[in-house]
A protein has these predicted regions:
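Membrane-embedded alpha-helical bundles of multi-pass transporters/translocases
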Residues: 1-499
Length: 499
């Protein structure tokens, strides 16, 4: 809808109406969720009254993030539709820096809080951790208004629904709400299962709860691959497909979708390799306060989720493509199958497996839930593209990328112990040791080895998408983007001469 609005003569007025509507709705939802915080905590968390009270306090501090994440998405999509990706992509870095300052201050004042009792968490400590996290998310959203002004759109509140495409957005929004409901119902099952795992392991086997992967391990593992990589790449690709669909150019949209899926497959298969080959160094490099023991607990779900990363990322692009066609029903049907598979499989798995394996099982189920319903997704997508979505070419590309990834995983797993020894590190739940510098060194060395092997395999398999994927990544990194048209080259030459 944003792409269509930008083509209108009074685009600024309509976009201001759209942003104002989004702000109003987000405020209403955020306030409602804040009022329902105790109930939501009971839905998601199992534990003692003290645990529930602490979870409620943290949740209440984090509730404003609903508003700011929503605002970030709306404003960011406007920037993306105008091909301004830099601020949208890098504002999250600022949010992470603010969060790290808060967590770093916490560690400096109080030490690591992993094994402290519940009464350790006083109001000031909760505010310092959850509060700075929310402050970072607020920065991530609000800073986007600066580039929004630079592209010629000065936001001012304008209330009104006429002319913003609400009639066409309404059904899509309704189906999207349905997706959120389905997703959260499955998340309730998953979160309660993973939260119970450490407590039940202690009751049944006498195992220290800190030695069992719980919900924190699952959530951290999930956030690493998906939000940092897949969402960023899908955001960069989506406006191009939207413009083609808005112009009723199905042939161009088909080319864009095919290229996007094939490029995403090449990129995501490499990251899947990284998560399988070196999960512990990656976790320790990105989360310096985590111990080796905790990193090992997080490694299981990270590996299993990494396997499904190429398919979850492909779905993200396909979902946005359906939205470009103003079709919210098809993504809803897919998510109904995917989340149904997750919820049912987790319930069955919790009955058959010991609690020590639950979180890894959840990661595996999450990966499979995006793989198994692919035929359904393919059938629905073909109808939108006149029964032709360049399927054979996409399938061959993914088979080549997966083949190269499997070979790279085998070689990477074979050499990783030698790399650990080279930097003086050791992986073990009891006697493991790896500091931050060693983790970064291991991750870098193994990434280089994996990259060389992966590229070699892609070349051997004659993958045409590899070069396109490299060009796509380079185009999103400031300073590396190459001009692709005569006008672009002239503008770059003028800029360089001006300097």
């Amino acid at each position: 809808q944003i792409v269509r609005t930008l083509k209108a003569k009074d685009a600024e007025t309509k976009l201001n109406k759209l942003i104002t509507l989004a702000i109003t709705m987000l405020l209403a939802v955020t306030i409602l969720m804040a009022l329902c915080t105790p109930l939501l905590t009971k839905l998601y968390v199992n534990g003692s009254p003290e645990t529930m009270a602490l979870a409620t306090s943290f949740t209440l501090w984090c509730m404003p993030q609903i508003f700011f994440y929503g605002l970030y998405t709306v404003v960011g999509q406007i920037l993306a539709a105008k091909d301004h990706f830099t601020a949208y992509a890098w504002s999250s870095v600022g949010a992470n820096i603010i969060s790290c300052i808060g967590f770093g201050t916490f560690i400096a004042l109080f030490g690591r809080a992993t094994e402290h009792p519940l009464d350790f968490w006083t109001a000031d400590k909760i505010a310092l951790t959850a509060g700075t996290w929310t402050l970072g998310v607020a920065f991530q959203a609000l800073v986007l208004f600066i580039p929004l002004t630079k592209i010629g759109l000065k936001y001012r509140p304008i209330f009104g629904l006429r002319g913003i495409g609400l009639r066409s957005m309404g059904p899509v929004a309704a189906w999207s709400v349905g997706i959120v409901v389905i997703d959260q119902l499955a998340n309730i099952v998953i979160t309660r299962t993973s939260t119970n795992a450490p407590m039940l392991a202690q009751q049944q086997f006498g195992i220290n709860p800190l030695d069992v992967a719980g919900n924190a391990s699952y959530q951290n593992a999930y956030m690493l691959p998906y939000s940092l990589i897949a969402v960023s790449l899908a955001t960069a690709i989506f406006p191009k497909i939207s413009r083609a669909v808005a112009d009723h150019n199905i042939a161009e949209a088909r080319i864009d979708l095919s290229q996007a899926l094939r490029n995403m497959g090449v990129i995501m298969c490499y990251f899947a390799v990284a998560f399988v080959v070196m999960p512990v160094p990656i976790i320790l490099a990105l989360l310096p306060s985590v111990s080796v023991r905790e990193a090992i607990l997080m490694a299981g779900p990270l590996v299993t989720l990494g396997v499904g990363l190429p398919f979850a990322s492909a779905y993200l692009i396909i979902q946005r493509t359906f939205y470009a066609f103003e079709d919210g029903k098809s993504p809803f049907i897919f998510m109904l199958f995917a989340m149904g598979i997750q919820a049912v499989s987790v319930i069955i798995g919790a009955k058959l497996l010991p609690p020590t394996e639950w979180t890894t099982m959840i990661g595996m189920v999450g990966a499979m839930s995006y793989i198994l319903p692919i035929p359904i997704l393919y059938a629905m997508l073909r109808k939108r593209f006149e029964n032709n979505i360049d399927g054979p070419r996409i399938a061959i590309s993914y088979l080549k990328s997966i083949g190269a990834a499997v070979a790279t995983m085998f070689i990477g797993v074979t050499v990783r112990d030698s790399v650990y020894q080279l930097v003086g590190a050791q992986i073990g739940a009891v006697d493991g040791h790896m500091n931050w510098i060693q983790a970064v060194a291991c991750a870098a060395l193994l990434a280089i080895v994996a990259f060389i092997v992966y590229v070699g395999m892609l070349r051997l398999l004659r993958s045409e998408e590899f070069k396109e994927a490299i060009a796509l990544i380079s185009s999103r990194i400031p300073g590396l983007r190459k001009p692709t048209s005569p006008n672009d080259r002239l503008e770059q030459d003028d800029a360089e001469n001006g300097e």
